[in-house]
Amino acid sequence: MNYNNPTQLQAAILDWAGTVVDFGSFAPTQIFVEAFAEFDVQVSIEEARGPMGMGKWDHIRTLCDQPQVAERYRKVFGRTPTDDDVTAIYNRFMPLQIEKIAEHSALIPGALETIANLRQQGIKIGSCSGYPKQVMDKVVALAATNGYVADHVVATDEVPNGRPWPAQALANVIALGIDDVAACVKIDDTVPGILEGRRAGMWTVALICSGNALGLDYEGYRALGSDALASERKRIHALFEGSRPHYMIDTITDLPEVIADINKRLANGEMPQSS
């Protein structure tokens, strides 16, 4: 029995917020701010966006480890945040997130058409998120009412380690019956999500305008002038550079051209690990 390189993509593993739904990835960001505020600790939107893509407990832990946030917490409680404190914030975050997730559940413009295009090519649609299953169940149900149903969904608490570990992406590979990770592409708007795909041995595509890095809603994105947009693209490209995405595009609507290019590279014998 011999190994043969895959010659075309079999699966696309899509992130959720900032990739398929919730242009600008506002749902989790605003709730982090509100959850900390209930403990009388101020966290800015910009600070809350920093660790985006990680599981939500890990996200809160990372925020609490930032010196300025830890100092604000110390001024209120007389100590820096422990893991028990992180869990307390997380336990407040969860019901707030579930309560308000519907406010940011709209599909990103062009997502349905792009996903339909992938399926017409025989590409399966896997998905994963930094949300825990309790939140994902609601996100999935809301997306279904808008016409989007992924072939598989993996929440961050359904694997031993969430992003940037590769477990969620690999769980999709197993569930979808994909025979080679090199026949998969991971699409995400965060650095941890791109690292997840890289570590899983997949092709990776970073979305630079629809998600956390730009942090604007669709109308704000469309209103950017050409110079401002070029400046933001340059800034965000630099943010993603260290995670080594194979491609960087504005939104999911630009994905079909990338898929065609990956299939061409696979047909020529190129593998994601070699670039």
UniProtKB/Swiss-Prot annotation:
It comes from the Bacteria. Its EC number is 3.11.1.1. One of its GO terms (biological process) is organic phosphonate catabolic process. The keyword Hydrolase applies. It catalyses: phosphonoacetaldehyde + H2O = acetaldehyde + phosphate + H(+). GO terms for molecular function: magnesium ion binding; phosphoglycolate phosphatase activity; phosphonoacetaldehyde hydrolase activity. Binds 1 Mg(2+) ion per subunit. Homodimer. The active site is at D15 (nucleophile), K56 (schiff-base intermediate with substrate). This is Phosphonoacetaldehyde hydrolase. GO terms for cellular component: cytosol. SUPFAM superfamilies: HAD-like. Its cofactor is Mg(2+). InterPro entries: HAD-like_hydrolase_sf, HAD-like_sf, HAD-SF_hydro_IA, HAD_sf, PGP-like_dom2, Phosphonoacetald_hydro. It holds the Pfam family Hydrolase. The keyword Lyase does not apply. Involved in phosphonate degradation. Mg(2+) binds at D15, A17, D189. Belongs to the HAD-like hydrolase superfamily. PhnX family. It comes from Pseudomonas fluorescens (strain Pf0-1).
